[in-house]
Amino acid sequence: LKRALISILALGLILIDSAPLRAETRTCHACGGAIQRTYFETKGFYYHPEHFTCTQCLSPISGSYTTYRGKNYHDSCFRDHVARKCSICGDVIGGQYLVDYWGNAYHATHRDQAISCDFCDRYITADLHDGGIRFDDGRSLCRICHATSVKKIGRARALMREVATQLERIGMDFREVDLDLHLIGLDKMQKLARNRSHDLRGFTDYHEEKNLFGKTRRRKIDIYLLYGMPKVEMIGTLAHELTHVWQFLRGRLQGDAAFSEGSCNFASYWVLKQMAPGEEANFIIESMLRDQDRVYGEGFRRVKKYVEKNGLSDWLALMAEKDPELPR
């Protein structure tokens, strides 16, 4: 999944020197009473000195102050209680900054310096997300994702059965195949996939034995997933790989790549909606919707549009065709 950071400009934080006290009669903008002697003037409004107060501490303001979203603050009150602070260094943010999917704000200068979680893209520091962990294969995992990470093969296989059950509800069938699951590191995954997979999370290896007459005697399929993957991420990845398995069983694995991979991503989308509704699933779905890859991103959006118009049954029937044509 690609990092989903948004570059935006900070809201105007205006540092203003207070106007000098004057000896004229005006109406106080705060209390509505007449001002007989001295007053503050700012932005066309007049105040008794004791009524020009800080929104945070309610004490009178003298000297310089900060105006933010129409409210006035002592500089120190704004800095300590109101100003947006960088989630990495803790300093006040001004000017241009970054906001991740989860609402964490960062100075733009940290973009190339901090380590981010390989799954949720949150930045990881000693103070942010409790430092996270690092796997031997180089992957980094924040503590939030680590709380649900799947490291035991028994748990992974149980999840695979749950995902398969969801896909069987819409017409897929996995009873015809000897199917096994393995948890491995990124280094081994890259060797298996020969670096050809998009945003590598899983890989499926297919074996088919035929007799002398060309009839299939046995099918053996091995699904490989990254060790330590967060639960929701694993659910989506299993749905993707199991849809490839179904395509293989129907002899349609080598069809149009955008339709094939887009369909697998749609299966991830559908299963996540059924099994794991929530912010983690929404993050994965949003990343797929924003993916600019012609095969995985555009393919997914085309399949999603097709299913929304024609339904799940028509989509499965189209996948089973020899040379399916997916409308653009």
What do the PLM-derived regions correspond to, one by one?
Residues 21-25:
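Boundary at the C-terminal end of the N-terminal hydrophobic targeting segment
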Residues 43, 80-82, 87-208:
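A metal-dependent hydrolase signature that marks the N-terminal structural subdomain at the beginning
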Residues 1-4:
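Positively charged n-region of N-terminal signal peptides that target proteins for export
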Residues 196-235, 242-249:
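Active-site scaffold of zinc-dependent metalloenzymes
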Residues 250, 254-295:
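Post-HExxH zinc-binding segment in Zn-dependent metallohydrolases
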Residues 83, 112-122, 132-133, 172, ...:
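Pan-zinc metallopeptidase signature
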Residues 7-16:
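Bacterial N-terminal signal peptides
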